[in-house]
Amino acid sequence: MALQVRVAPSKVVLQKFLLCVILFYTVYYVSLSMGCVMFEVHELNVLAPFDFKTNPSWLNINYKVLLVSTEVTYFVCGLFFVPVVEEWVWDYAISVTILHVAITSTVMLEFPLTSHWWAALGISKLLV
């Protein structure tokens, strides 16, 4: 029995990828907003999804909001990507993560070298 592989046209792949990116950042900002309400944070930077310089401490409320929103975003997006892409969910999830790292580096003008940020992304990938 031969292995059959279907290859989607590039336009379809790019449309699905763009939809996944929009979905990712929408879920990210919604989870940030909910985190701010839950943890009673009255102000949070608009660039919060890209912030890897926040002091990693359980006493730091902003760090808790960022960490929880990151984990919730990846978990929820893992569920939302399934009906959007139907297959190859891991490919899209990893591609969105690579784009997120690139955007983060561009926004913060520095490549994220902090271990807690990478650990959060690594744990998030396991949730997908």
From Swiss-Prot:
GO terms for cellular component: membrane. The chain crosses the membrane at residues 17-37, 65-85, 93-113. The keyword Metal-binding does not apply. It is a multi-pass membrane protein. It is found in: Membrane. Its main location: membrane. Keywords: Membrane, Transmembrane, Transmembrane helix. This is Putative transmembrane protein 244. The lineage of its organism: Eukaryota, Metazoa, Chordata, Craniata, Vertebrata.
